[in-house]
Amino acid sequence: MPSEKATTRHLPGAVETLSPRTGRRPETPAYGSWLLGRVSESPRMRRVRIQGMLTVAILVTNVIGLIVGAMLLTVAFPKPSVILDAPHWVSFGIVPGYCVLAFILGTYWLTRQTARALRWAIEERTPSHDEARSAFLVPLRVALAVLFLWGAAAALWTIIYGLANRLFIPRFLFSMGVIGVVAATSCYLLTEFALRPMAAQALEVGATPRSLVRGIVGRTMLVWLLCSGVPNVGVALTAIFDDTFWELSNDQFMITVLILWAPLLIFGFILMWILAWLTATPVRVVREALNRVEQGDLSGDLVVFDGTELGELQRGFNRMVEGLRERERVRDLFGRHVGREVAAAAERERPKLGGEERHVAVVFVDIVGSTQLVTSRPAAEVVMLLNRFFTVIVDEVNHHRGLVNKFQGDASLAVFGAPNRLSHPEDAALATARAIADRLASEMPECQAGIGVAAGQVVAGNVGAHERFEYTVIGEPVNEAARLCELAKSYPSRLLASSQTLRGASENECARWSLGETVTLRGHDQPIRLTSPVQQLQMPAQSADIVGGALGDHQTHTIYRGAHPTD
């Protein structure tokens, strides 16, 4: 039993791939089998592949049917003998001649009808709605053609052999009828499999599949009828004909039943295998695609190649992935407009008006001489320059886990400590300011900017109305950073911070800054001590005018070496 289960479990792999099995299960191809090629395959190569598969599948199926029929007519029902008790010109002339003619005419007619139905694929164009619906009928037409040829053979041979001996009549009707139905159904399923690439293109235009049976239930019941119904009917008819016409011995009756049962068992096994594989493959494709989505890959859609409910499953997966892609696009745009941290906070909890007190550090950056910059350059060049300028700022702010809260013309405001809490927001802000100053000096020497850094308590939250609001920070540190940025434009370093900001910084960061003079910023009552990167702070010639004459006495510049500054 374990060996049988293992064999059954691995059988579908023989259809999926011809390559040896490795330790890792190969990924299911887009059409469910490597035999059908890739989606990117050229149309000409796909036509050759499909035509070859159809020809081989139909010929092999019918050759096997002829072999089984010969066994039934000669071994299962030996009397009367089709060789000894029938005219030789029938057994060695009519029958072989009909088989050859049926193969030739059948192959020609099926090839022509298939090519006509798939003309759009040969011409490498998108099918119309009617052409797409016609493509779904190809498997049914193939099955009906095969059934017609077997039915014609049954009628012709029954009449000819019946004229020689009436006992041939039920034998030929029964044998040819059963084999014809099984062969036609096998050709139907194999043709449906081979035409999956064409069905996928037809489904893209929205055509409704038209087939012999509808849905998974219809397909399953059809195979059940052939695998279980036909053998049972065959055994019952054998018993009836034996009692009525043949009068077989017990041994001969047993041989007849076994010969009738064995081929139908094999054919039934093959049909059930094909049915199980046709059903499982779309599910496996969707399952593997779900695994890719779970890993964050939303790049690919499934090829919808099944006309049953499984095709609706594939279509539903594509709609789901498109929705996820749209959601990611909206999330990306939202994050670009308001900042990744604000977007993440909005996803975690429903946004509401109001805010909370936070300890943050603020970096304000503004271009020096922006009016002259705008008037001296074309508008397109100014936009490109501003984009490069803001790219430097955004890169460094993101690198230090800050939030670019606003773009105001040629200025920007970055916040550290809101909405994401930071253990040392001063360190992050000061390091960001230094990095921006260094990069602007090296990468954009034509664009100089003043940079101000301040820290303290602010109110951070959503400001506006219920219909339209934005996340921002309000408080004295924001105003102080803006005034320091304005003052920094007159210093060679272009970067100033307050000594209060350095009080909250680490010793490692403080060692990179130098204390300067004490000033009273415009709009402020209390003086503050300026700091700037080490060995860069210099007093401007007309700084008294800039700070409103409140500079006071010149302070001695000292290098800060680890001790916290005091006013």
Swiss-Prot record:
Membrane topology: Multi-pass membrane protein
GO molecular function annotation: adenylate cyclase activity
Cited InterPro entries: A/G_cyclase (IPR001054), Adenylyl/Guanylyl_Cyclase_3/4 (IPR050697), HAMP_dom (IPR003660), Nucleotide_cyclase (IPR029787)
GO biological process, one term: intracellular signal transduction
Domain Guanylate cyclase: residue ranges: 361-485
Residue segments, region Disordered: 1-26
Domain HAMP: 278-329
GO cellular component, one term: plasma membrane
Keywords, sorted A to Z: Cell membrane, Membrane, Transmembrane, Transmembrane helix
PROSITE patterns documented for this protein: GUANYLATE_CYCLASE_2, HAMP
Main location: membrane
Gene3D superfamilies found in the cross-reference section: 6.10.340.10, Nucleotide cyclase
Superkingdom classification of source: Bacteria
Subcellular location: Cell membrane
TM regions (residue ranges): 57-77, 90-110, 142-162, 173-193, 221-241, 257-277
Family the entry assigns: Belongs to the adenylyl cyclase class-3 family.
Identification of the protein by name: Uncharacterized protein Rv1320c
